[in-house]
Structures are given as C-alpha cells and as structure tokens.
C-alpha cells in the first residue's frame, strides 16, 4: 500500500515541501534562517492575536490599553515583550537570510529572490505600522516623520500625506488604519512566503559551493528537520533570554511617555533595524533625494542578479569579493550606529561617507572585482 503522505492531496504538498524534498547534502547553518523566519512569523501572528484581544486602536485609550495588558492581563507583559522582541529577532534572521543569499549567489534564482525582496518590504511596512500602535512619543513622532516623507513627491505629495493620515495630522484615523494594516499584513506575508517557497522548490536549494548538486541530494527529513529544530531551539532561547532578562534593551525610553503632539522628543529615531536606512535618508540634505536614497537602499537588492559578473556563483572561492562583502556588512553596521546618533559633526560626515560607500560597493566595486577575479582565473 502506498504511504498516505504520498497520495493524499494535502499531505502530498507537505510531503514534497518538508519530508521527501531532495536537498543538497552540504548546506550549512546559514540555510537555517528560512525556517527560523517561518517560526518568527508564526510567533508574531500568535502573540499579536492575543495582544489584539486586549488592545484598543483609539488615541485616548491605546497607551492605557498597553499598560493594562502589561499590568492586568495574565502574562500580558510576556506576550507584549515576546511580540516586541520577536520583531527584533525577525529582522536579525531576515538580514542574515539576505546576507546568505548575497554571499552564496542565491539571487540567481531570480523569482525566489524578487519575491524575497517584496517580502522584506512588506515585513518592514508591518513593523513600521506596528511601532505606531502603542501611541507613545516615539510612535507618534516616528509616524509623523516617516509618513511626511511622502510630501516630497512632486505635485501630489501633500494630498497623498493627508490621504494616508485621514486628516491634517497623525490622529485617531491614522491609528485605526495602521492597526488594520498591522493586522492584515502578516497574513499577506504568510501568502507571499508560500509563493517564495513555491519558486524555491521549482529550482531546488543552492549550496555553499554554488554548483549543481543534483547528483548528491538527501531527503529533507530527518536530516534537515532535526537541524532546523536545533536552530529553532537556539532562536527561542535567545528570544526568551532577551524577553525575560532585558525586555527594554532594544526599545526607546521615549515610548513610555504618552504621545503628545505639542512636545517633540530631542532625538526622533526608528527601531534599531531601520537605523541603517534612516542614516542613508538623513545623509542627503535634499528631501526628495533622501527619500529616493532610502527607497533605493532596499530596492537595490532587485538589481543584484543583473550586477553579477562573476563566472562563479558563490563567493566561497573568491577572496576579493569576500573582502568587499564583509566591508559591506561593516558599512551597514556603521550606518546603523550613525542612524541612532544626533545630527551633528562628525556623525553627518561619517553618515554621508558610509552611504556613498554602500552604493559604491554594490553598484561598482563588487561587479568590477568579480570581473578582475575572472581575469585572474583566466576565465
């Protein structure tokens, strides 16, 4: 008798995606982040659902409802901090996942890569609207500053901003719609993630050497299920440690002050995972230029498959490209640090230099280095 998992219409999909999936035998722990992102998403949806049961999306009660969740709801504080720090874990996994794709040339699976970039944008949008919901000072001013960037769009800018706000400033209408967006977007992310997997399973996984592995495949289960479980345990341990020992480590103290349109915080800055993009935005003195640079800093990922000039797929055997890759990582860490600093000397200049280097590395230096490496190998 044929196994039910191979015949049942629903079980067959699960079987082909997670059990009998032929997988390269040599993929490293860098390939764990896909499953970890799935785990993060499920955690966020579940904790978010329980938070939504107690939250009220109204300017007069939003802040109080968060306080109520933390003080009066059974283990409400755990759920709230798991959700807040879960977002940080989500972005750590996201950036590691994208970095892995860049290093090992996974971007040559163009459909998978482009859906991945769309997913990155959607997760960033979800995190942004979610940060507004507690209605603290940083929530309010963050929403005001970032939505105001749309006013840089010529001709329709101001109208567009007021349309997004639902009025003449960030107010009740804005909070209500942001809550609606924050609730619906994770389910859109879930659907996109399925499309991402669909495209991935059309080609099969890449591997660290970047060479075809059809002659050396192993079943996903048990080899990679057990490996994913180890990764999941490490992620859960890190999340619980952060949540239970230092829940406010990555947050902003200003968000414990209720939103006040009449007093601006000294330093308006987003959560840590947006600081690199914020630094790029601030490093350009022109408003429209800054907005374009901000968008391009992420959209540039879409160009990467077209900028691949090497005859090899992976960077595993390309030391010069490796050096530039780690320079890019260091540059992004520098931008993250600068994004959290006040707008004054020397941070402004450093931010401008780091922003120029970011685009220079991706658009010019890395493709040129790949060509030089081809020449060195007489290819």
Swiss-Prot record:
Annotated compartments: Mitochondrion inner membrane
TM spans (from-to): 33-53, 77-98, 113-133, 178-198, 226-246, 288-308, 320-340, 347-367
Binding site for heme b b566: 97, 196
Cofactor binding annotation: Binds 2 heme b groups non-covalently.
Main location: mitochondrion
Gene Ontology CC terms, in alphabetical order: mitochondrial inner membrane; respiratory chain complex III
Residue positions binding heme b b562: 83, 182
Record key words, sorted: Electron transport, Heme, Iron, Membrane, Metal-binding, Mitochondrion, Mitochondrion inner membrane, Respiratory chain, Transmembrane, Transmembrane helix, Transport, Ubiquinone
The UniProt record lists the keyword Heme: yes
Protein topology in the membrane: Multi-pass membrane protein
CDD domains xrefs: cytochrome_b_C, Cytochrome_b_N
Pfam families registered for this protein in UniProt: Cytochrom_B_C (PF00032), Cytochrome_B (PF00033)
Coiled-coil portions: none
GO biological process, one term: mitochondrial electron transport, ubiquinol to cytochrome c
Cofactor: heme b
Gene Ontology molecular function, alphabetical: metal ion binding; ubiquinol-cytochrome-c reductase activity
Residue numbers binding a ubiquinone: 201
Keyword Aminoacyl-tRNA synthetase attributed: no
Note: Heme 1 (or BL or b562) is low-potential and absorbs at about 562 nm, and heme 2 (or BH or b566) is high-potential and absorbs at about 566 nm.
Family: Belongs to the cytochrome b family.
Subunit structure: The cytochrome bc1 complex contains 11 subunits: 3 respiratory subunits (MT-CYB, CYC1 and UQCRFS1), 2 core proteins (UQCRC1 and UQCRC2) and 6 low-molecular weight proteins (UQCRH/QCR6, UQCRB/QCR7, UQCRQ/QCR8, UQCR10/QCR9, UQCR11/QCR10 and a cleavage product of UQCRFS1). This cytochrome bc1 complex then forms a dimer.
Protein name, as recorded: Cytochrome b
Lineage: Eukaryota, Metazoa, Chordata, Craniata, Vertebrata
């Amino acid at each position: 008798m044929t196994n039910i998992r191979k015949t049942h219409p629903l079980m067959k999909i699960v079987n082909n995606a997670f059990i009998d999936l032929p997988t390269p035998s040599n993929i490293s722990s860098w390939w764990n982040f896909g499953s970890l992102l799935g785990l993060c998403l499920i955690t966020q949806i579940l904790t978010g659902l329980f938070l939504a049961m107690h939250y009220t999306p109204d300017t007069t009660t939003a802040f109080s409802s968060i306080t109520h969740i933390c003080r009066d709801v059974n283990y409400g504080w755990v759920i709230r901090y798991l959700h807040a720090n879960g977002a940080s874990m989500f972005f750590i996994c996201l950036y590691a996942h994208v970095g892995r794709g860049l290093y090992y040339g996974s971007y040559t699976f163009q459909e998978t890569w482009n859906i991945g970039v769309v997913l990155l944008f959607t997760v960033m949008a979800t995190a942004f609207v979610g940060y507004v919901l507690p209605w603290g000072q940083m929530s309010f001013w963050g929403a005001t500053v970032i939505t105001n960037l749309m006013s840089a769009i010529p001709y329709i800018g101001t109208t567009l901003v007021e349309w997004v706000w639902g009025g003449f400033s960030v107010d009740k209408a804005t909070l209500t719609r942001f809550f609606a967006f924050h609730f619906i977007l994770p389910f859109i992310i879930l659907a996109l993630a399925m499309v991402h997997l669909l495209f991935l399973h059309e080609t099969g996984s890449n591997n660290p050497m970047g060479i075809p592995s059809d002659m050396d495949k192993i079943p996903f289960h048990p080899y990679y299920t057990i490996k994913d479980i180890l990764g999941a345990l490490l992620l859960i341990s890190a999340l619980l440690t952060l949540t239970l020992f230092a829940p406010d480590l990555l947050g902003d103290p200003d968000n414990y002050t209720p939103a006040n349109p009449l007093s601006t915080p000294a330093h308006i800055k987003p959560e840590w995972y947006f600081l690199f993009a914020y630094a790029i935005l601030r490093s350009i003195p022109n408003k429209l230029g800054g907005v374009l640079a901000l968008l391009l800093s992420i959209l540039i990922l879409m160009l990467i498959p077209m900028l691949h000039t090497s005859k090899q797929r992976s960077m595993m055997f390309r030391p010069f490209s490796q050096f530039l890759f780690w320079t890019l990582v260091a540059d992004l860490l520098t931008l993250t640090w600068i994004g959290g600093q006040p707008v004054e000397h020397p941070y402004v200049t450093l931010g401008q230099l780091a922003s120029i280097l970011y685009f220079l590395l991706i658009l010019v230096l890395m493709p040129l280095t790949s060509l030089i490496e081809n020449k060195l190998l007489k290819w």
